[in-house]
């Protein structure tokens, strides 16, 4: 169910903009085939939902024959950035990943090759893991240019006795976005300035830094899990969207496809509390995404600033509950309080939009 201004993940958009609406649908339906003979690995994953049929994973890998903990992979697989990108969808405590993850890492996966390095289990550094690779940069679509993006993460994970566990990671993304026009826009103060690129087919750099941390422990209340992640950097997008490329053909040389380079900030927190030994879990999530940290409030939409609703920040408070019938079946109810930055100069965003969402989901995993 969504309020009148909401966007839901299943079904069509609202047919009556003055009223709330509801939709029923298949959000995810996946089947994964995996192979592992100790040295060679491979996987194919297919997704079926109310939008059609597509593939999710398609990769092969070769492990080192000595420790079998380091690996070289090639194909389509999760991008090694942060913690939530690679977190299993079937284990998510909220219906969707954080806003900035959905915007910057559509489908979570990309075409590429990645090297994973880990020491043997008896080493004092066995809790460390380094992932680094080169990727096409436009999700699971076919590659459209000759530039490759670098993505890497150094992570650590370690148990604390038999009662707790911690983890942390630092991630880096260095890539480029294709600009099909002769113009591009960059921030100067609180407004965009137009740059003449001199030719079509140039590129603008996108660069992200990420930090993530996880901590879980057991107590008389049950298992408590805390997770946090933050990203900062620059993201080229178009006037109408700050999302990462997610297309299978290069955009055309049209004014609306000119790139805007935005400095961004995004972060999110999870608190998941199992209720003792019962099958219930309570979930609290806070999610913030500011696509342009150089402007705020009524600076957005100002005359000759070239800013728009795309530059407004958004945040979400999510509250939910999970009931695990068994290890295969779980029921999830989750309510999202969505908030947007307001500007008197952006039509439709003078006040907070009515776009809260209630999701009730039944999941079966086998």
Over which residues does each language-model region extend?
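Outer membrane beta-barrel
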Residues: 1-139, 144-151, 155-162, 172, ...
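Outer-membrane beta-barrel pore domains
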Residues: 17, 62, 164-174, 180-366
């Amino acid at each position: 169910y969504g309020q009148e201004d909401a966007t839901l993940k299943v079904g069509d958009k609202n047919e009556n903009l003055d009223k709330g609406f509801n939709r029923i649908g298949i959000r995810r339906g996946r089947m994964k085939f995996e192979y592992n003979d100790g040295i060679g690995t491979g996987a194919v994953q297919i997704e079926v939902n109310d939008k059609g049929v597509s593939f999710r994973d398609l990769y092969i890998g070769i492990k080192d024959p000595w420790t079998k903990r380091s690996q070289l992979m090639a194909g389509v697989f999760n991008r090694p950035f942060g913690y939530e990108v690679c977190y299993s969808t079937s284990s998510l405590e909220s219906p969707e990943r954080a806003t900035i993850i959905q915007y910057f890492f559509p489908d979570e996966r990309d075409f590429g090759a990645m090297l994973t390095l880990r020491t043997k289990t008896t080493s004092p550094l066995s809790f460390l893991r380094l992932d680094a690779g080169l990727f096409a940069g436009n999700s699971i679509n076919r590659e459209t240019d000759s530039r490759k993006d670098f993505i890497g993460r150094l992570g650590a994970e370690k148990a604390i006795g038999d009662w707790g566990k911690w983890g942390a990671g630092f991630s880096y993304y260095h890539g480029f976005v294709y600009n099909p026009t002769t113009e591009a826009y960059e921030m100067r103060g609180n407004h965009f300035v137009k740059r003449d690129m001199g030719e079509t087919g140039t590129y603008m750099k996108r660069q992200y830094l990420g930090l993530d941390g996880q901590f879980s422990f057991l107590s008389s209340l049950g298992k408590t899990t805390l997770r946090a992640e933050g990203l900062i950097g620059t993201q080229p997008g178009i006037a109408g969207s700050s999302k990462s490329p997610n297309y299978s053909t290069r955009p055309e040389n049209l004014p609306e496809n000119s790139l805007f380079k935005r400095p961004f900030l995004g972060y999110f927190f999870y608190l998941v509390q199992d209720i003792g030994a019962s099958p219930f879990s309570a979930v609290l999530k806070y999610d913030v995404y500011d696509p342009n940290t150089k402007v705020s409030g009524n600076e957005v939409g100002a005359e000759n600033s070239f800013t728009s609703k795309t530059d407004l920040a958004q945040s979400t408070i999510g509250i939910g509950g999970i009931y695990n019938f068994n290890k295969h079946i779980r029921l999830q109810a989750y309510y999202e309080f969505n908030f947007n930055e307001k500007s008197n100069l952006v039509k439709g965003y003078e006040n907070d939009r009515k776009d809260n969402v209630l999701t009730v989901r039944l999941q079966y995993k086998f």
